[in-house]
Amino acid sequence: MREKLIFDLSRNGRKGYSLSKNDLPETSVAAVIPSKFLRTTPAELPEVPESEVVRHFIRLSNLNYHVDKNMYPLGSCTMKYNPKVNDYTCDLPGFSTLHPLQPSETTQGALRLMYELSSMLSEIAGMAAVSLQPAAGAHGELTGILLIKKYHEAQGKMRNKLLVVDSAHGTNPASAAIAGYEIISVRSNADGRTDLEDLKARLQSDVAALMLTNPNTIGLFEKDILAIERMVHENGSLLYMDGANMNALLGITRPGDMGFDVVHYNLHKTFSAPHGGGGPGSGPIGVSARLAGYLPVPVIEKEESATGTSYRLNYDRPESIGRMISFYGNFSVLVRAYTYIRMLGPEGLRRVSENAIINANYLLSLLLERYDLPYPKSVMHEFCLSGDRQKKANGVKTLDMAKRLLDYGFHAPTIYFPLIVSEALMIEPTETETKETLERFAEAMIAIADEAENNPALVKSAPETTPVKRLDEAQASRQLNICCSL
C-alpha cells in the first residue's frame, strides 16, 4: 500500500510535542519582530502524534534504497560502504558544536584537522597545495578553472578556449562555460582513450587548458598521459584532472607525478562520506606550485612559537581568487575523510584501489558473454557495457534493463553515460563488495539478458515489485510541480 504524505496523516489537535513552562515574562511577537516578517495566517504544519511520526518515517526508510542495504553500482559515483566510525568522529562535540564565526583560538582542533587533511591530500595526489573550500566536485572544477584563468591573466595571455575530452563528465564543460570559456571537444580514439592526433590539432595558442579524467569514464587509464602532458604544456596550456575516479589510483600513482596542474578530489566518493540526494559533498582542489598563490582565502597555516604549535586563517593573499564558499568547506565531510585516511594509512589506501580494480575486472568477466563491451577488456575501477545487442534483437533498451534490475533488489547502474557508448551501462562495484555480492549481481544481470531474449515484454514493463511502477520521467523533469503550501 502506498505511504500517505505526512500532511494526510494530520488531524486537528493531535500534536506530538510539549514545551517546558515559560519562566520568562510573556512578550508579544509583534513587539520583537517587524510586522513585515510575520505571517498573516498560521502555518499549515501537520499535527501528528510522535508514534505516527516515527512509524511514518520508518516505513519510508524501508522503501528507500541505500548502500547499507545492498550493492549500489552507479558508475563514476563510487558508492562504497561508509564506515560508521566516520560518523562517530564527526559527531564528537568538539567538532559538531563549533560555529564558523568563532575566534580561531577557540577552534584549534578543527583547524589542525583541516591543515593535516590538506597535507595528506597533497601527498596522496602529489600536489603542492590544497584548498578544502569547494563544496562538491563541480564546485571544485569551477574553482580550478578560475585558478587557471587567473594564472593566464597574470601571464598577460587572455586565452579563451578550453579543451574537454568527449568522454568527460557533463560538469566539465558546464564549469568551463560558467567561467567564460568556449568549449572545444577532443575525440576519443577506437580504444576509448584520448585521440592524440585530434588533441594536437586543437591545441592552439588560445587554449587555456585541457580537462581530462584519469582513469576516464569508461574505466580506462590514459596510457599516453605523459605524452598528453608534454603536448599541453609545450603549448603553454595547463592540465586539469577531474578526480572523480581517484578510487583507482590511491597509492598506485599520483596526478602530480603525471604533470597535472590542478586536480579536484571528491571526498564524498573516494574518501567515504555518505552522498546522494544532493549531498553533502566536498570537492577540494590540489594545485601545482605555480598556482598555489591563487588559492581561495583564507588559507590555513601552521605556526610554531615558544608557546607551542597553533593554526591560523590567513586572508592576506593578494593574488588569491577570493572566497569560493561562505566559510571553510563542508566540515562534516572533511572530518569523515580525515578519519577514513587515518584509519587506513598509506598501505590501506593502496589496497582500496587494488581491490576496486580487482572487483571491477572480476564482475566484468562474469558479464562479458551476455553484454557487449565496446572497448578493451582490461579496466581499472569501473567498466561500461552496451545494451545494443538486446536493443537490436528485441527492442529492449538499456533503460528497460535498468528498471528490471530494481525487481532483483539492486540499484541500477549509471545509464546512457558516457555519451560515446551507445546504450551505455556504466558499472562501478567499488572495493567494499564481496565476491558473493558481485556474483549475485551478475546472476541478476544475466537473468535479465535471458528475459530480454525470451520475454522482452516483461523487461519493457519493469519494474513490477517496487512501491511505484515506471514513471514518465521526461514529463516529471519538464513539468515539475510540487505542491505543498505552508
Swiss-Prot record:
<dbReference type="GO" id="GO:0030170">
    <property type="term" value="F:pyridoxal phosphate binding"/>
</dbReference>
<dbReference type="InterPro" id="IPR020581">
    <property type="entry name" value="GDC_P"/>
</dbReference>
<dbReference type="Pfam" id="PF00266">
    <property type="entry name" value="Aminotran_5"/>
</dbReference>
<dbReference type="GO" id="GO:0019464">
    <property type="term" value="P:glycine decarboxylation via glycine cleavage system"/>
</dbReference>
<dbReference type="GO" id="GO:0005829">
    <property type="term" value="C:cytosol"/>
</dbReference>
<dbReference type="InterPro" id="IPR015424">
    <property type="entry name" value="PyrdxlP-dep_Trfase"/>
</dbReference>
<comment type="function">
    <text>The glycine cleavage system catalyzes the degradation of glycine. The P protein binds the alpha-amino group of glycine through its pyridoxal phosphate cofactor; CO(2) is released and the remaining methylamine moiety is then transferred to the lipoamide cofactor of the H protein.</text>
</comment>
<protein>
    <recommendedName>
        <fullName>Probable glycine dehydrogenase (decarboxylating) subunit 2</fullName>
        <ecNumber>1.4.4.2</ecNumber>
    </recommendedName>
</protein>
<keyword id="KW-0560">Oxidoreductase</keyword>
<comment type="subunit">
    <text>The glycine cleavage system is composed of four proteins: P, T, L and H. In this organism, the P 'protein' is a heterodimer of two subunits.</text>
</comment>
<dbReference type="GO" id="GO:0016594">
    <property type="term" value="F:glycine binding"/>
</dbReference>
<dbReference type="InterPro" id="IPR023012">
    <property type="entry name" value="GcvPB"/>
</dbReference>
<dbReference type="InterPro" id="IPR049316">
    <property type="entry name" value="GDC-P_C"/>
</dbReference>
<dbReference type="GO" id="GO:0005960">
    <property type="term" value="C:glycine cleavage complex"/>
</dbReference>
<keyword id="KW-0663">Pyridoxal phosphate</keyword>
<dbReference type="GO" id="GO:0004375">
    <property type="term" value="F:glycine dehydrogenase (decarboxylating) activity"/>
</dbReference>
<dbReference type="InterPro" id="IPR015422">
    <property type="entry name" value="PyrdxlP-dep_Trfase_small"/>
</dbReference>
<dbReference type="Pfam" id="PF21478">
    <property type="entry name" value="GcvP2_C"/>
</dbReference>
<feature type="modified residue" description="N6-(pyridoxal phosphate)lysine">
    <location>
        <position position="269"/>
    </location>
</feature>
<dbReference type="InterPro" id="IPR015421">
    <property type="entry name" value="PyrdxlP-dep_Trfase_major"/>
</dbReference>
<dbReference type="InterPro" id="IPR000192">
    <property type="entry name" value="Aminotrans_V_dom"/>
</dbReference>
<comment type="similarity">
    <text>Belongs to the GcvP family. C-terminal subunit subfamily.</text>
</comment>
